Amino acid sequence: MTGSLWVGTYPDGGPAGSGEGIWRVRVDASTGELSAARLVVETPAPSFLALHPRGHTLYAVAEVDKGTVTAFAVSPDGLAPLGTQATGGALPCHVLATADALYVANYGSGDFTTFGLAADGGFAGGPEVHGNSGSGPDPERQEGPHAHYIGIVGDEVWVSDLGTDELRRYRPRPGGASAAGIAARLPAGAGPRHFVAIGDVVVVATELVAGVYVLDHQTAAVVARHDVAAARGHLQPSHLALSPDGSHLFVAVRGVDVLSTFAVSAGAVRLEHLADTPVGRGPRHFAVLPPIAGTDAALVVVADQQASTLTALRVDRETGSGTPVGSVPLPAPACVLPAR
C-alpha cells in the first residue's frame, strides 16, 4: 500500500520567494521506502503546513518578514490556491487548522493570529491578531516574544512563546479566540518550543536549555524534567510527537542530530529514555505514520533540513532504536505532513 506526504521547505540557498515550495513524496507503507518526490506548487518559504480535518484544504505559512498564509484546495492533480491572507505579524512559523478556524504563530513579532474558515476551507474574513510582550534572560533569542507553536489542550488553544518562557491559553469562539491568560511558565531561559498534550499532562520540548518538561494540565506545575538525549554537546530540540498508540514519545534534536525515543507510562508522568537514532543534519520536524505493515514498529519520517533529505526510520517498539528504511533528496525540508 502506498501513501503520500506533503513537505514544506525553506529557501534553498537564496532569499525567501526564490523558488521554494510544497512537495509531495510517496511512501510505501509496507517497507517505509520513499520515492517520487515532486514539486507540486511554488510558494514562498512554506516552512509549516496544516491540513484541514476534512482533508480538502492545505494551508502553508510564508515565513517572511510580512507574513502570509495561503489556503490550497487539494485534488488528485495537485494544489490550487484558494486565497492568501496577511497574518499581521512577522515570520509565521506554525499553523494549525480546525473545522472552522485557522491559527498561526508569528515567531518574529510574537503575535498569535486567528482566521475564520468557510465550508470550502477558504478564509472567512480577515485576521484577528493577539499580541504579546515580555522577554527572557537570553539576550540573543529572548529579546522579545516569539510565538512558536500552537496546540489544542482540552477545550483551549495553547501557544508556546520561546521568548517569554510561557505557554499562553486562548478560548476558541466563532471566527477567532479570546485570550485567557498564562497556562504555564517554564524556567527562565528554557525557551519552550513545541509541546503535546497527553491525558492530564502537557509535555514540552525546550530549545534554549535543552530538555523535556512534563507539566500538570490543571496546576501548570512541573511534574518532571528529562534530558532530551543521552548524547552530550550542543542540543537543540525542535519537534516532539507521540506514536499512534501513545506508548512512545519521539523528540528531534538538532546539534547532535538524533531522533530520541522515550517510553511513556503512568499517564506520561514517567518518560523512560530508550534510544537516540542518528539522522541527517538539522532534523527540524518529523511525521509519525502508522506502523509498517505486519509489524508493531513505528514509521517516522524526518525532515533533515540542513542535509536536504527526508529520512524514514523503522523504530523498534522495545528498544526504541531506529533503522533507516528510506530516504529521498529534497531541498531544505522543514515540515512533513501525512496526506489523506
Regions found by a protein language model. Give the residues of each.
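Short coil/turn segments that connect the beta-strands within blades of beta-propeller domains
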Residues: T2-G3, R54-H56, A99-D100, G154-D155, ...
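Conserved beta-strand positions in repeat-built beta-propeller and related beta-rich domains
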Residues: V7-P11, P15-A16, A60-V64, V104-G108, ...
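Beta-rich catalytic cores
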Residues: S18, P44-S47, L91, H146, ...
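Short loop/turn segments immediately following beta-strands, especially the blade-tip
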Residues: V25-G32, A71-G78, F115-A124, R171-A177, ...
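Conserved beta-strand position repeated across blades of beta-propeller domains
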Residues: V41, A50, L96, G151, ...
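Asp-box/WD-like beta-propeller blade repeats and closely related beta-sheet repeat scaffolds
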Residues: L79-Y149
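Surface-exposed loop and turn segments in beta-propeller and other repeat-based domains
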Residues: P127-Q142, A224-R232, D276-P278, P329-R340
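Loop/turn-rich, solvent-exposed surfaces of beta-rich toroidal or solenoidal domains
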Residues: L235-V302
